[in-house]
Amino acid sequence: MRVVTRFAPSPTGSLHLGGARTALFNWLFARHHKGKFLLRMEDTDKKRSSDVVVQSIIDDMSWLGLQHDGDIVVQSSRAARHVAVARELVELGRAYRCYCSEDEVNEQKLQSEGTGKYFRHVCPWKHLNSTGDLPNKPYVVRLKSPENTTIEFLDGVYGKISVKSDQIDDMVILRSDGTPTYLLAVVVDDHDMEITHIIRGSDHITNTVKQIVLAEAMSWVSPKFFHIPLIHDENGAKLSKRNRAPGIHEYKEQGFLPEALCNYLLRMGWSYQNKEIVSMQEAIALFSMEDVGVSCSCLDYKKLVFLNHHYMGSKSESEILDLLLPILEEKLGGRISEEKLSRLSLGIKQLVERAKTLTDLAEDSLFYVQDVEININPEAVETIQNSKKFLAELLESMSGIHPDMWKKTHLSSQIKEFSKTRNLAMSDVYHFLRASITGRLQSPNISEVMEILGQEMCINRMLSAQEI
Protein backbone atom coordinates (compact mmCIF):
# COMPACT_ATOMS: atom_id res chain seq x y z
CA MET A 1 0.00 0.00 0.00
CA ARG A 2 1.38 3.38 -1.01
CA VAL A 3 1.16 6.00 1.73
CA VAL A 4 -0.93 9.06 0.82
CA THR A 5 -1.29 11.92 3.31
CA ARG A 6 -2.94 15.30 2.96
CA PHE A 7 -2.99 18.76 4.43
CA ALA A 8 -6.45 20.29 4.28
CA PRO A 9 -6.52 23.87 5.57
CA SER A 10 -9.58 26.09 5.56
CA PRO A 11 -8.70 29.29 3.64
CA THR A 12 -10.37 31.57 6.17
CA GLY A 13 -7.16 32.74 7.83
CA SER A 14 -3.41 32.69 7.41
CA LEU A 15 -1.32 29.59 8.05
CA HIS A 16 -0.48 29.47 11.77
CA LEU A 17 1.97 27.36 13.75
CA GLY A 18 -0.50 24.56 14.47
CA GLY A 19 -1.47 24.21 10.82
CA ALA A 20 2.15 24.40 9.69
CA ARG A 21 3.13 21.64 12.12
CA THR A 22 0.26 19.48 10.83
CA ALA A 23 1.44 20.06 7.26
CA LEU A 24 5.04 19.29 8.24
CA PHE A 25 4.18 16.00 9.97
CA ASN A 26 2.05 14.85 7.02
CA TRP A 27 4.79 15.87 4.58
CA LEU A 28 7.52 14.08 6.55
CA PHE A 29 5.41 10.94 6.98
CA ALA A 30 4.76 10.78 3.22
CA ARG A 31 8.38 11.50 2.29
CA HIS A 32 9.70 8.95 4.81
CA HIS A 33 7.49 6.26 3.28
CA LYS A 34 8.16 7.46 -0.29
CA GLY A 35 4.48 8.24 -0.63
CA LYS A 36 2.42 11.23 -1.74
CA PHE A 37 1.58 14.44 0.12
CA LEU A 38 -1.56 16.12 -1.21
CA LEU A 39 -3.01 19.57 -0.61
CA ARG A 40 -6.75 20.25 -0.36
CA MET A 41 -8.40 23.60 0.27
CA GLU A 42 -11.50 23.09 2.39
CA ASP A 43 -13.37 26.17 1.24
CA THR A 44 -16.94 25.10 2.00
CA ASP A 45 -17.34 28.22 4.19
CA LYS A 46 -17.72 30.51 1.18
CA LYS A 47 -18.49 33.62 3.24
CA ARG A 48 -15.13 33.49 5.03
CA SER A 49 -12.96 31.81 2.39
CA SER A 50 -10.70 33.98 0.26
CA ASP A 51 -8.54 33.45 -2.82
CA VAL A 52 -5.98 35.79 -1.27
CA VAL A 53 -5.75 33.52 1.79
CA VAL A 54 -5.49 30.45 -0.45
CA GLN A 55 -2.47 31.97 -2.18
CA SER A 56 -0.90 33.04 1.12
CA ILE A 57 -1.18 29.46 2.45
CA ILE A 58 0.42 28.11 -0.74
CA ASP A 59 3.20 30.72 -0.49
CA ASP A 60 3.87 29.96 3.18
CA MET A 61 4.06 26.22 2.53
CA SER A 62 6.40 26.79 -0.40
CA TRP A 63 8.61 29.01 1.78
CA LEU A 64 8.76 26.24 4.40
CA GLY A 65 9.77 23.78 1.68
CA LEU A 66 6.61 21.67 2.03
CA GLN A 67 5.93 21.02 -1.65
CA HIS A 68 2.75 19.07 -2.36
CA ASP A 69 2.29 16.40 -5.01
CA GLY A 70 -0.20 16.73 -7.84
CA ASP A 71 -2.85 19.40 -8.28
CA ILE A 72 -4.48 21.22 -5.40
CA VAL A 73 -7.95 19.86 -4.69
CA VAL A 74 -10.53 22.59 -4.10
CA GLN A 75 -13.31 21.14 -1.99
CA SER A 76 -16.10 23.41 -3.25
CA SER A 77 -15.47 22.28 -6.83
CA ARG A 78 -16.51 18.76 -5.80
CA ALA A 79 -19.91 19.71 -4.35
CA ALA A 80 -21.82 17.67 -6.95
CA ARG A 81 -19.93 14.53 -5.92
CA HIS A 82 -20.65 15.21 -2.24
CA VAL A 83 -24.36 15.69 -2.94
CA ALA A 84 -24.45 12.47 -4.98
CA VAL A 85 -23.06 10.51 -2.01
CA ALA A 86 -25.68 12.04 0.30
CA ARG A 87 -28.45 11.01 -2.10
CA GLU A 88 -26.99 7.51 -2.36
CA LEU A 89 -27.08 7.22 1.44
CA VAL A 90 -30.75 8.24 1.43
CA GLU A 91 -31.52 5.63 -1.24
CA LEU A 92 -29.68 3.01 0.82
CA GLY A 93 -31.80 3.91 3.84
CA ARG A 94 -28.72 5.05 5.79
CA ALA A 95 -29.66 8.72 5.73
CA TYR A 96 -32.99 10.56 5.75
CA ARG A 97 -34.65 13.88 5.07
CA CYS A 98 -35.32 15.82 8.25
CA TYR A 99 -38.06 18.46 7.93
CA CYS A 100 -37.70 19.78 11.46
CA SER A 101 -37.13 23.52 11.57
CA GLU A 102 -34.22 25.04 13.44
CA ASP A 103 -36.68 26.29 16.08
CA GLU A 104 -38.01 22.77 16.62
CA VAL A 105 -34.50 21.38 17.06
CA ASN A 106 -33.64 24.16 19.51
CA GLU A 107 -36.85 23.49 21.46
CA GLN A 108 -35.86 19.83 21.84
CA LYS A 109 -32.42 20.89 23.01
CA LEU A 110 -33.94 23.28 25.55
CA GLN A 111 -36.15 20.52 26.98
CA SER A 112 -33.14 18.20 27.39
CA GLU A 113 -31.18 20.71 29.47
CA GLY A 114 -30.74 19.67 33.08
CA THR A 115 -31.11 15.96 32.33
CA GLY A 116 -27.35 15.43 32.39
CA LYS A 117 -27.59 13.47 29.16
CA TYR A 118 -25.95 14.22 25.83
CA PHE A 119 -28.48 15.96 23.59
CA ARG A 120 -29.37 13.87 20.59
CA HIS A 121 -31.98 15.25 18.22
CA VAL A 122 -34.92 12.86 17.73
CA CYS A 123 -36.39 13.47 14.31
CA PRO A 124 -39.98 12.25 13.74
CA TRP A 125 -39.19 11.87 10.04
CA LYS A 126 -36.36 9.40 10.59
CA HIS A 127 -38.44 6.32 9.77
CA LEU A 128 -41.09 7.95 7.57
CA ASN A 129 -39.07 8.85 4.50
CA SER A 130 -40.28 5.82 2.56
CA THR A 131 -44.02 6.44 2.98
CA GLY A 132 -44.19 8.98 0.17
CA ASP A 133 -46.35 11.27 2.32
CA LEU A 134 -43.70 13.96 2.85
CA PRO A 135 -44.21 17.70 3.37
CA ASN A 136 -43.36 20.21 0.68
CA LYS A 137 -40.94 22.31 2.70
CA PRO A 138 -37.18 22.69 3.17
CA TYR A 139 -35.28 19.81 4.71
CA VAL A 140 -31.78 18.77 5.69
CA VAL A 141 -30.33 15.32 5.11
CA ARG A 142 -29.16 13.55 8.24
CA LEU A 143 -27.05 10.41 8.53
CA LYS A 144 -28.56 7.63 10.63
CA SER A 145 -26.07 7.15 13.41
CA PRO A 146 -25.67 3.62 14.82
CA GLU A 147 -27.61 2.70 17.95
CA ASN A 148 -26.74 0.63 21.02
CA THR A 149 -23.12 0.14 20.06
CA THR A 150 -19.65 1.57 20.58
CA ILE A 151 -17.57 3.22 17.90
CA GLU A 152 -13.88 2.40 18.30
CA PHE A 153 -10.73 3.23 16.45
CA LEU A 154 -7.03 2.82 17.15
CA ASP A 155 -5.39 6.22 17.13
CA GLY A 156 -1.71 6.21 16.17
CA VAL A 157 -0.82 8.53 19.07
CA TYR A 158 -3.43 8.08 21.81
CA GLY A 159 -4.20 4.40 21.29
CA LYS A 160 -7.70 2.94 21.49
CA ILE A 161 -10.50 5.54 21.52
CA SER A 162 -14.09 4.48 22.20
CA VAL A 163 -17.31 6.49 22.01
CA LYS A 164 -20.79 5.18 22.77
CA SER A 165 -23.21 5.61 19.91
CA ASP A 166 -25.71 7.51 22.08
CA GLN A 167 -23.10 10.31 22.18
CA ILE A 168 -23.35 10.77 18.42
CA ASP A 169 -26.15 12.79 16.87
CA ASP A 170 -27.74 12.06 13.51
CA MET A 171 -25.39 14.52 11.85
CA VAL A 172 -26.49 16.82 9.05
CA ILE A 173 -24.71 15.96 5.80
CA LEU A 174 -26.73 18.19 3.44
CA ARG A 175 -27.98 21.64 4.45
CA SER A 176 -31.45 22.91 3.60
CA ASP A 177 -29.99 24.86 0.65
CA GLY A 178 -28.64 21.61 -0.78
CA THR A 179 -24.98 22.28 0.01
CA PRO A 180 -22.82 19.58 1.65
CA THR A 181 -21.51 19.99 5.18
CA TYR A 182 -17.86 19.83 6.15
CA LEU A 183 -18.17 16.31 7.60
CA LEU A 184 -19.60 14.85 4.40
CA ALA A 185 -17.16 16.66 2.11
CA VAL A 186 -14.13 15.56 4.14
CA VAL A 187 -15.05 11.88 4.15
CA VAL A 188 -15.87 11.80 0.43
CA ASP A 189 -12.71 13.68 -0.53
CA ASP A 190 -10.45 11.54 1.66
CA HIS A 191 -11.95 8.43 0.06
CA ASP A 192 -11.70 9.69 -3.52
CA MET A 193 -8.16 11.02 -2.99
CA GLU A 194 -7.22 7.58 -1.60
CA ILE A 195 -5.86 9.07 1.61
CA THR A 196 -4.28 6.33 3.73
CA HIS A 197 -3.12 8.28 6.79
CA ILE A 198 -4.48 11.44 8.42
CA ILE A 199 -2.34 13.40 10.88
CA ARG A 200 -4.07 16.34 12.56
CA GLY A 201 -4.69 18.07 15.88
CA SER A 202 -6.32 16.31 18.81
CA ASP A 203 -9.19 18.81 18.64
CA HIS A 204 -10.43 16.76 15.66
CA ILE A 205 -11.01 13.53 17.61
CA THR A 206 -14.76 14.18 17.89
CA ASN A 207 -14.94 14.79 14.13
CA THR A 208 -12.98 11.60 13.49
CA VAL A 209 -15.57 9.46 15.26
CA LYS A 210 -18.34 10.99 13.12
CA GLN A 211 -16.30 10.59 9.95
CA ILE A 212 -15.71 6.91 10.70
CA VAL A 213 -19.47 6.44 11.13
CA LEU A 214 -20.11 8.16 7.79
CA ALA A 215 -17.44 6.12 5.99
CA GLU A 216 -18.88 2.88 7.38
CA ALA A 217 -22.31 3.90 6.08
CA MET A 218 -20.76 3.96 2.60
CA SER A 219 -18.87 0.70 3.29
CA TRP A 220 -15.58 2.55 2.91
CA VAL A 221 -12.39 1.80 4.82
CA SER A 222 -11.32 4.80 6.88
CA PRO A 223 -7.72 6.06 6.80
CA LYS A 224 -5.41 5.47 9.75
CA PHE A 225 -5.72 8.41 12.16
CA PHE A 226 -3.01 10.13 14.20
CA HIS A 227 -4.11 12.95 16.49
CA ILE A 228 -1.28 15.15 17.72
CA PRO A 229 -1.46 17.18 20.96
CA LEU A 230 -2.19 20.88 20.55
CA ILE A 231 0.32 23.69 20.89
CA HIS A 232 -0.01 25.88 23.98
CA ASP A 233 1.50 29.26 24.78
CA GLU A 234 4.57 29.86 26.94
CA ASN A 235 2.43 29.62 30.08
CA GLY A 236 0.78 26.35 29.10
CA ALA A 237 -2.56 27.92 28.13
CA LYS A 238 -4.43 26.93 24.97
CA LEU A 239 -3.89 29.17 22.00
CA SER A 240 -7.00 31.06 20.90
CA LYS A 241 -7.96 33.81 18.46
CA ARG A 242 -7.05 36.38 21.09
CA ASN A 243 -4.08 34.46 22.42
CA ARG A 244 -2.55 33.18 19.21
CA ALA A 245 0.91 32.51 17.89
CA PRO A 246 2.05 34.64 14.94
CA GLY A 247 1.26 33.37 11.45
CA ILE A 248 4.02 31.82 9.36
CA HIS A 249 4.32 34.98 7.26
CA GLU A 250 4.92 36.97 10.45
CA TYR A 251 7.83 34.73 11.44
CA LYS A 252 9.22 35.21 7.94
CA GLU A 253 8.91 38.99 8.28
CA GLN A 254 10.67 38.81 11.65
CA GLY A 255 13.69 37.30 9.91
CA PHE A 256 13.43 33.62 10.83
CA LEU A 257 14.71 31.03 8.37
CA PRO A 258 12.36 28.29 7.10
CA GLU A 259 14.87 25.62 8.19
CA ALA A 260 14.79 26.94 11.75
CA LEU A 261 11.00 27.15 11.85
CA CYS A 262 10.62 23.60 10.49
CA ASN A 263 13.11 22.28 13.05
CA TYR A 264 11.22 24.17 15.77
CA LEU A 265 7.85 22.75 14.66
CA LEU A 266 9.31 19.25 14.34
CA ARG A 267 10.43 19.28 17.96
CA MET A 268 6.94 20.31 19.09
CA GLY A 269 5.75 16.83 19.86
CA TRP A 270 8.33 14.67 18.05
CA SER A 271 11.71 13.68 19.39
CA TYR A 272 14.53 11.32 18.50
CA GLN A 273 17.24 10.59 21.06
CA ASN A 274 16.89 14.12 22.42
CA LYS A 275 18.31 15.67 19.23
CA GLU A 276 17.53 19.39 19.13
CA ILE A 277 18.98 20.22 15.72
CA VAL A 278 17.50 18.06 12.97
CA SER A 279 17.71 19.05 9.31
CA MET A 280 14.78 18.21 7.05
CA GLN A 281 16.84 15.57 5.25
CA GLU A 282 17.60 13.95 8.60
CA ALA A 283 13.97 14.27 9.62
CA ILE A 284 12.77 12.46 6.49
CA ALA A 285 15.05 9.54 7.34
CA LEU A 286 14.17 9.46 11.06
CA PHE A 287 10.51 10.48 11.17
CA SER A 288 8.06 8.08 12.77
CA MET A 289 4.72 8.83 14.40
CA GLU A 290 5.74 6.37 17.13
CA ASP A 291 8.08 9.11 18.39
CA VAL A 292 5.26 11.62 18.88
CA GLY A 293 4.28 12.09 22.52
CA VAL A 294 0.86 12.73 24.06
CA SER A 295 1.83 15.86 26.02
CA CYS A 296 1.00 19.30 24.69
CA SER A 297 3.90 21.37 23.40
CA CYS A 298 4.47 24.95 24.54
CA LEU A 299 5.81 27.86 22.55
CA ASP A 300 9.44 28.58 23.36
CA TYR A 301 10.70 31.70 21.64
CA LYS A 302 14.21 31.30 23.02
CA LYS A 303 14.48 27.86 21.43
CA LEU A 304 13.36 29.24 18.07
CA VAL A 305 15.96 32.02 18.31
CA PHE A 306 18.64 29.45 19.21
CA LEU A 307 17.74 27.32 16.20
CA ASN A 308 17.64 30.32 13.89
CA HIS A 309 21.08 31.45 15.03
CA HIS A 310 22.40 27.94 14.34
CA TYR A 311 20.97 27.77 10.81
CA MET A 312 22.16 31.28 9.99
CA GLY A 313 25.66 30.28 11.08
CA SER A 314 25.56 27.15 8.93
CA LYS A 315 24.97 29.10 5.72
CA SER A 316 27.73 30.32 3.42
CA GLU A 317 28.44 34.03 3.22
CA SER A 318 27.00 34.18 -0.30
CA GLU A 319 23.78 32.48 0.86
CA ILE A 320 23.41 34.95 3.72
CA LEU A 321 24.04 37.90 1.39
CA ASP A 322 21.38 36.62 -1.03
CA LEU A 323 18.86 36.53 1.83
CA LEU A 324 19.98 39.84 3.29
CA LEU A 325 20.14 41.98 0.16
CA PRO A 326 16.35 42.30 -0.48
CA ILE A 327 15.78 43.32 3.16
CA LEU A 328 18.51 45.96 3.03
CA GLU A 329 17.34 47.35 -0.32
CA GLU A 330 13.81 47.64 1.05
CA LYS A 331 15.13 49.48 4.11
CA LEU A 332 17.23 51.86 2.00
CA GLY A 333 14.64 52.27 -0.75
CA GLY A 334 16.93 51.38 -3.64
CA ARG A 335 19.64 49.18 -5.07
CA ILE A 336 22.95 48.78 -3.25
CA SER A 337 26.14 49.48 -5.20
CA GLU A 338 28.82 46.87 -5.78
CA GLU A 339 31.25 48.89 -3.65
CA LYS A 340 28.93 48.78 -0.66
CA LEU A 341 28.18 45.10 -1.22
CA SER A 342 31.91 44.44 -1.25
CA ARG A 343 32.25 46.12 2.16
CA LEU A 344 29.34 44.13 3.51
CA SER A 345 30.75 40.83 2.24
CA LEU A 346 34.04 41.52 4.04
CA GLY A 347 32.27 42.09 7.35
CA ILE A 348 29.32 39.71 7.12
CA LYS A 349 30.92 36.78 8.96
CA GLN A 350 31.38 38.73 12.20
CA LEU A 351 27.86 40.16 11.94
CA VAL A 352 26.28 36.71 11.52
CA GLU A 353 28.05 35.50 14.66
CA ARG A 354 26.10 38.09 16.66
CA ALA A 355 22.71 38.17 14.91
CA LYS A 356 19.66 36.16 15.94
CA THR A 357 17.46 36.82 12.91
CA LEU A 358 17.79 38.21 9.40
CA THR A 359 16.06 41.42 10.51
CA ASP A 360 18.62 41.78 13.31
CA LEU A 361 21.37 41.16 10.80
CA ALA A 362 19.97 43.74 8.38
CA GLU A 363 19.77 46.36 11.13
CA ASP A 364 23.28 45.54 12.36
CA SER A 365 24.81 45.72 8.87
CA LEU A 366 23.27 48.99 7.67
CA PHE A 367 26.44 50.96 8.43
CA TYR A 368 28.35 48.92 5.82
CA VAL A 369 25.96 49.86 3.00
CA GLN A 370 25.22 53.47 3.90
CA ASP A 371 27.20 56.55 2.92
CA VAL A 372 28.55 59.16 5.34
CA GLU A 373 25.08 59.85 6.75
CA ILE A 374 24.08 56.83 8.83
CA ASN A 375 21.25 55.91 11.17
CA ILE A 376 22.42 56.72 14.69
CA ASN A 377 20.33 55.25 17.51
CA PRO A 378 19.46 57.36 20.59
CA GLU A 379 22.02 55.69 22.87
CA ALA A 380 24.78 56.35 20.34
CA VAL A 381 23.69 59.99 19.98
CA GLU A 382 23.95 60.48 23.73
CA THR A 383 27.41 58.87 23.79
CA ILE A 384 28.65 61.13 20.98
CA GLN A 385 27.27 64.27 22.64
CA ASN A 386 29.03 63.38 25.89
CA SER A 387 32.38 62.70 24.17
CA LYS A 388 32.79 65.48 21.58
CA LYS A 389 36.08 66.79 23.00
CA PHE A 390 37.73 63.37 22.88
CA LEU A 391 36.09 62.55 19.56
CA ALA A 392 37.67 65.66 18.02
CA GLU A 393 41.08 64.69 19.38
CA LEU A 394 40.71 61.11 18.16
CA LEU A 395 39.63 62.40 14.75
CA GLU A 396 42.85 64.41 14.53
CA SER A 397 44.86 61.32 15.48
CA MET A 398 43.07 59.12 12.92
CA SER A 399 43.49 61.72 10.17
CA GLY A 400 47.25 61.60 10.61
CA ILE A 401 47.54 57.88 9.87
CA HIS A 402 49.15 57.10 6.51
CA PRO A 403 46.62 55.36 4.19
CA ASP A 404 48.95 52.36 3.84
CA MET A 405 48.80 51.89 7.63
CA TRP A 406 45.00 51.85 7.78
CA LYS A 407 44.93 48.23 8.99
CA LYS A 408 43.13 46.78 11.99
CA THR A 409 46.34 45.95 13.91
CA HIS A 410 47.73 49.45 13.53
CA LEU A 411 44.34 51.02 14.28
CA SER A 412 44.07 48.97 17.47
CA SER A 413 47.51 50.19 18.56
CA GLN A 414 46.56 53.81 17.84
CA ILE A 415 43.33 53.55 19.81
CA LYS A 416 45.15 51.92 22.71
CA GLU A 417 47.78 54.66 22.71
CA PHE A 418 45.11 57.35 22.52
CA SER A 419 43.22 55.97 25.54
CA LYS A 420 46.45 55.67 27.50
CA THR A 421 47.62 59.26 26.87
CA ARG A 422 44.14 60.65 27.69
CA ASN A 423 43.79 58.41 30.73
CA LEU A 424 40.57 56.98 29.29
CA ALA A 425 39.24 53.46 29.60
CA MET A 426 39.57 51.55 26.34
CA SER A 427 35.87 50.67 26.56
CA ASP A 428 34.92 54.37 26.65
CA VAL A 429 37.00 55.14 23.57
CA TYR A 430 35.52 52.17 21.73
CA HIS A 431 32.03 53.37 22.69
CA PHE A 432 32.22 56.85 21.18
CA LEU A 433 34.28 55.66 18.21
CA ARG A 434 31.78 52.88 17.47
CA ALA A 435 28.86 55.29 17.94
CA SER A 436 30.26 57.79 15.42
CA ILE A 437 31.26 55.23 12.78
CA THR A 438 28.45 52.62 13.01
CA GLY A 439 25.68 54.59 14.72
CA ARG A 440 25.43 51.88 17.37
CA LEU A 441 27.05 50.97 20.68
CA GLN A 442 27.50 47.33 19.66
CA SER A 443 29.30 46.10 16.57
CA PRO A 444 32.01 43.65 15.56
CA ASN A 445 35.63 44.58 16.35
CA ILE A 446 35.73 48.31 15.57
CA SER A 447 39.30 48.22 14.22
CA GLU A 448 38.23 45.56 11.73
CA VAL A 449 35.14 47.58 10.81
CA MET A 450 37.29 50.67 10.24
CA GLU A 451 39.66 48.77 7.96
CA ILE A 452 36.73 47.51 5.88
CA LEU A 453 35.06 50.93 5.62
CA GLY A 454 38.32 52.66 4.75
CA GLN A 455 39.98 55.78 6.09
CA GLU A 456 38.01 58.35 4.08
CA MET A 457 34.61 56.98 5.09
CA CYS A 458 35.58 56.70 8.78
CA ILE A 459 37.01 60.24 8.92
CA ASN A 460 33.92 61.67 7.20
CA ARG A 461 31.57 59.87 9.59
CA MET A 462 33.52 61.13 12.59
CA LEU A 463 33.31 64.66 11.16
CA SER A 464 29.56 64.22 10.63
CA ALA A 465 29.13 62.95 14.21
CA GLN A 466 30.65 66.17 15.55
CA GLU A 467 27.68 68.06 14.10
CA ILE A 468 25.19 66.16 16.28
Curated annotation (Swiss-Prot):
<feature type="short sequence motif" description="'KMSKS' region">
    <location>
        <begin position="238"/>
        <end position="242"/>
    </location>
</feature>
<feature type="binding site">
    <location>
        <position position="241"/>
    </location>
    <ligand>
        <name>ATP</name>
    </ligand>
</feature>
<dbReference type="GO" id="GO:0000049">
    <property type="term" value="F:tRNA binding"/>
</dbReference>
<dbReference type="GO" id="GO:0005524">
    <property type="term" value="F:ATP binding"/>
</dbReference>
<dbReference type="InterPro" id="IPR020751">
    <property type="entry name" value="aa-tRNA-synth_I_codon-bd_sub2"/>
</dbReference>
<dbReference type="GO" id="GO:0006424">
    <property type="term" value="P:glutamyl-tRNA aminoacylation"/>
</dbReference>
<keyword id="KW-0030">Aminoacyl-tRNA synthetase</keyword>
<dbReference type="InterPro" id="IPR014729">
    <property type="entry name" value="Rossmann-like_a/b/a_fold"/>
</dbReference>
<keyword id="KW-0067">ATP-binding</keyword>
<dbReference type="InterPro" id="IPR008925">
    <property type="entry name" value="aa_tRNA-synth_I_cd-bd_sf"/>
</dbReference>
<dbReference type="GO" id="GO:0008270">
    <property type="term" value="F:zinc ion binding"/>
</dbReference>
<dbReference type="InterPro" id="IPR004527">
    <property type="entry name" value="Glu-tRNA-ligase_bac/mito"/>
</dbReference>
<comment type="subunit">
    <text>Monomer.</text>
</comment>
<dbReference type="InterPro" id="IPR049940">
    <property type="entry name" value="GluQ/Sye"/>
</dbReference>
<comment type="function">
    <text>Catalyzes the attachment of glutamate to tRNA(Glu) in a two-step reaction: glutamate is first activated by ATP to form Glu-AMP and then transferred to the acceptor end of tRNA(Glu).</text>
</comment>
<keyword id="KW-0648">Protein biosynthesis</keyword>
<keyword id="KW-0963">Cytoplasm</keyword>
<feature type="short sequence motif" description="'HIGH' region">
    <location>
        <begin position="9"/>
        <end position="19"/>
    </location>
</feature>
<dbReference type="InterPro" id="IPR000924">
    <property type="entry name" value="Glu/Gln-tRNA-synth"/>
</dbReference>
<dbReference type="Pfam" id="PF19269">
    <property type="entry name" value="Anticodon_2"/>
</dbReference>
<dbReference type="InterPro" id="IPR020058">
    <property type="entry name" value="Glu/Gln-tRNA-synth_Ib_cat-dom"/>
</dbReference>
<dbReference type="Pfam" id="PF00749">
    <property type="entry name" value="tRNA-synt_1c"/>
</dbReference>
<dbReference type="GO" id="GO:0004818">
    <property type="term" value="F:glutamate-tRNA ligase activity"/>
</dbReference>
<keyword id="KW-0436">Ligase</keyword>
<dbReference type="InterPro" id="IPR045462">
    <property type="entry name" value="aa-tRNA-synth_I_cd-bd"/>
</dbReference>
<comment type="similarity">
    <text>Belongs to the class-I aminoacyl-tRNA synthetase family. Glutamate--tRNA ligase type 1 subfamily.</text>
</comment>
<keyword id="KW-0547">Nucleotide-binding</keyword>
<protein>
    <recommendedName>
        <fullName>Glutamate--tRNA ligase 2</fullName>
        <ecNumber>6.1.1.17</ecNumber>
    </recommendedName>
</protein>
<dbReference type="InterPro" id="IPR033910">
    <property type="entry name" value="GluRS_core"/>
</dbReference>
<dbReference type="InterPro" id="IPR001412">
    <property type="entry name" value="aa-tRNA-synth_I_CS"/>
</dbReference>
<dbReference type="GO" id="GO:0005829">
    <property type="term" value="C:cytosol"/>
</dbReference>
